[in-house]
Amino acid sequence: MIKSELVQIVAARNPHLYHRDVENIVNAVLDEITDALASGNRVELRGFGAFSVKNRPSRTGRNPRTGDTVFVEEKWVPFFKTGKELRERLNPGMDDEDDGDAD
């Protein structure tokens, strides 16, 4: 699903709202999540999951074309950890022994 499809679905479920307003709301929510992550904050949507940023330290890598070693600088990467309700909905009937951490 892409953002425009999400806007269409939300607008269809809420016929009292204009499509333009739904698009503005979706964009505002995504902008706020992005701004929070850019500030180093964690964004938790209870039951759905939590967005955060993790540091990927610098390392020595390899150029796949030439085989030469290259230095890869450290960087911050977005990370998403699923919430319990989302994991249960994706895996009905399974025990919740895994914490859903993709590390």
From Swiss-Prot:
DNA repair in keyword set: no
InterPro entries tied to this protein: Hist_DNA-bd, Histone-like_DNA-bd_CS, IHF-like_DNA-bd_dom_sf, IHF_beta
GO biological process: DNA recombination; regulation of DNA-templated transcription; regulation of translation
GO molecular function: DNA binding; structural constituent of chromatin
Pfam families: Bac_DNA_binding
Keywords tagged on the record: DNA recombination, DNA-binding, Transcription, Transcription regulation, Translation regulation
Coiled coil: none
One GO CC term on file: cytosol
Database matches in PROSITE patterns: HISTONE_LIKE
Keyword DNA-binding: yes
Quaternary assembly: Heterodimer of an alpha and a beta chain.
NCBIfam families attached to this UniProt entry: hip, PRK00199.1
Family designation: Belongs to the bacterial histone-like protein family.
Role: This protein is one of the two subunits of integration host factor, a specific DNA-binding protein that functions in genetic recombination as well as in transcriptional and translational control.
Name under which the protein is recorded: Integration host factor subunit beta
